[in-house]
């Protein structure tokens, strides 16, 4: 090994040793199994906003996480949604929910999860289809997840969501 290669190798080792310790690995079934609570907000480009609290209960059967979400909005309205996340690989899931059109494909990457899905916001006979792009980030201590989502109508961003989950 030449002197040049030894110097490069030394710098590389020094660089690797100065990197921060790895963050907690996100696994949906580990975080959401059992009881979880959350607070969140939804805002649109027109200025409409809405706050909510969520009580969650997750059941894991070794392959599928069933995650019931009981919403209570600041105006008193209540709603319940149930996600079903089927694990399809070490870092992938397929998710379904009552108001989701088709499936949400979920990809985990370290302390983060990424997924997107279509939702029909109009519960009546009309259609108001938007696409959510969610990013979940697990805290270093593994006790909280911050979910930030962008909402698009076609190519246009129309809303955003933030939800803070706590174990």
Predicted features by range, described:
Residues 23-35, 135:
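N-terminal helix-cap/turn-to-beta initiation motif at the start of protein domains
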Residues 131-167:
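Glycine-rich, aromatic-bearing surface loops/beta-hairpins
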Residues 33-35, 64, 142:
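Extracellular Ig-like/FN3 beta-sandwich strand-entry sites
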Residues 8-18:
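Bacterial N-terminal signal peptides
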Residues 39-125, 133-137:
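Central antiparallel beta-sheet cores of small beta-barrel/beta-sandwich binding domains
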Residues 1-9:
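Bacterial N-terminal signal peptides that target proteins for export
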Residues 32-40, 147:
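A short, Trp-centered hydrophobic/proline-enriched beta-strand micro-motif
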């Amino acid at each position: 090994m030449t002197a040049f290669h030894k110097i490069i190798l030394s710098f590389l080792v020094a660089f690797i040793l100065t990197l921060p310790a790895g963050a907690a690995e996100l696994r949906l079934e580990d975080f959401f199994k059992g009881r979880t609570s959350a607070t969140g907000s939804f805002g649109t480009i027109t200025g409409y906003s809405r706050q909510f609290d969520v009580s969650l209960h997750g059941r894991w059967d070794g392959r599928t996480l069933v995650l019931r979400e009981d919403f209570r909005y600041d105006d008193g309205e209540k709603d319940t949604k149930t996600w079903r996340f089927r694990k399809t690989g070490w870092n992938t899931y397929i998710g379904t929910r009552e108001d989701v059109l088709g499936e949400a494909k979920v990809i985990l990457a370290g302390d983060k999860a990424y997924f997107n899905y279509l939702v029909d916001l109009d519960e009546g006979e009309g259609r108001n289809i938007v696409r959510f792009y969610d990013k979940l980030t697990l805290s270093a201590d593994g006790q909280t997840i911050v979910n930030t989502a962008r909402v698009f109508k076609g190519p246009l961003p129309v809303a955003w969501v933030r939800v803070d989950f706590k174990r």
